A protein has these predicted regions:
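A short beta-strand element within beta-rich, extracytoplasmic domains
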Residues: 71, 81-93, 219
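Extended extracellular/luminal ectodomain segments enriched in beta-structured repeat modules
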Residues: 64-66, 76-86, 254-257, 267-270
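Residue-level hotspots within well-ordered secondary structure
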Residues: 225-368
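Proprotein-processing/basic-patch segments
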Residues: 24-30, 167-228, 357-368
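Flexible, small-residue-rich N-terminal segments that precede or flank a structured functional core
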Residues: 22-74, 197-200, 210-216, 220-224
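Short edge-strand/loop segments of extracellular domains
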Residues: 89-127, 197-199, 211-213, 277-284, ...
Length: 368
């Protein structure tokens, strides 16, 4: 290969070598609580500033306590691939040295009730609280007292001195847990936190979502978002060409530019425009083609397809619209981080049924 050709190929090869884009989101809980091994299931702490895990001393009737915490991971777009998960809890009180605490994936839904516990012993349960026996006091039960969860820990961590965040580092199982919640949101019940139980003191106090913002539980999720994906069927135009939608770049809430939604193989020197919606895809017959975007739709500015100059009549036309410019303009508040957008081109085709053409469509998410 000549040096000149090699030089021309270098930018292309560099683009091909770029790693897949990764995004990171930090989330706080949607619910957390402590349950206590009260044999009649009448003890909990749902709305307190702190939660507890491990074994307390013998001066209490219910020494074993377990903390539960769940996070809404819907900020990670559906179809994403999770690559790393870290779980962070702020530990604010202990009377023992370092102990190992584990996270276990919960397998049954539970409710964060109204009860506030003002100490490590919690308080009497009220309707809607979780307890050692109940997912929802006092008429919905765990299958197994103490909570239904996967026996094998998703992560473990030695926790020692107070007044600091402790981070369970990413493990294959933590990644699998969060991936399963993204793929199947109805199974997202969170984790239960356990310390050594049944023997010597081991209990630790952690801050909850009701605490000050700087102490609240967190998860940090790193993920590879799904690429823009073409779907639906384009209407064949009057010359027998099938327009094809495409894109370069990605929809970025903060970029300001750099996400071109394109259309090729369309009629030359014709008016057209990109339209879009945020309520998902559709497959409805429309003007001899298919409406691929769920109403209501929004239109962008009209363009000319260019291509061969008149009087030529061919399929050398094309369109391009930088969607990041629209996002950055703030003209549509629905174009927010994590939003699914579906987009499609409409263009003039004077010799076709209804004198119009509809392309196939593109679905994509807006990333932070």
């Amino acid at each position: 290969m000549s040096p000149r050709i090699s030089a021309l190929l270098l930018p292309v090869l560099a683009l091909l070598a770029l790693p897949a884009r990764s995004d990171v989101v930090t989330l706080t809980p949607i619910k957390d609580a402590t349950i206590y091994n009260d044999t009649v299931g009448n003890r909990c702490d749902s709305k307190g500033l702190t939660m507890y895990a491990g074994q307390a001393g013998t001066n209490t009737t219910w020494p074993t306590r377990r903390a539960m915490v769940a996070f809404d991971v819907s900020a990670v777009p559906a179809g994403s691939t999770v690559t790393s998960v870290q779980v962070k809890l702020y530990m604010s009180k202990t009377v023992v040295g370092a102990k190992t605490f584990t996270l276990h994936k919960l397998t049954r839904g539970w409710n964060e009730g109204p009860t506030v516990g003002f100490s490590g012993d919690g308080n009497s349960a009220q309707v809607g609280d979780p307890t050692w026996l109940h997912t929802y006091f006092n008429n919905q039960l765990w299958t197994t007292p103490g909570g239904d969860f996967v026996a094998t820990a998703s992560a473990s961590l030695s926790i020692g001195s107070t007044y600091q965040y402790y981070t369970w580092g990413s493990t294959a199982q933590l990644v699998a847990d969060v991936q399963s919640w993204i793929d199947n949101p109805s199974t997202n019940y969170g984790w239960i936190v356990r310390g050594p139980e049944g023997g010597a003191k081991s209990a630790k106090q952690f801050e909850t979502r009701e605490s000050l913002a700087r102490y609240r539980p967190q998860i940090v999720v790193t993920y590879t978002p799904p690429p823009p994906t073409a779907y639906c069927t384009a209407k064949t135009n009057s010359l027998g060409c099938v327009p094809a939608i495409g894109s370069t770049g990605s929809a970025d809430f903060n970029a300001g530019s750099g996400f071109a939604i394109t259309l090729s193989n369309t009629l030359n020197q014709k008016a057209g425009l990109l339209f879009y919606g945020t309520l998902g895809p559709a497959t409805a017959p429309f003007q001899g083609g298919t409406m691929c975007v769920q109403a209501p739709i929004q239109r962008t500015v009209a363009q000319n397809s260019g291509g061969s100059a008149s009087p030529a009549n061919d399929c050398t036309g094309s369109f391009s619209y930088d969607f990041n410019v629209l996002i950055a303009s703030g003209a549509n508040s629905q174009l927010s981080v994590g939003r699914l957008v579906c987009a499609q081109y409409w263009s003039r085709d004077p010799a076709a049924t209804f004198t119009t053409n509809l392309s196939n469509a593109l679905r994509f998410y807006i990333y932070p």
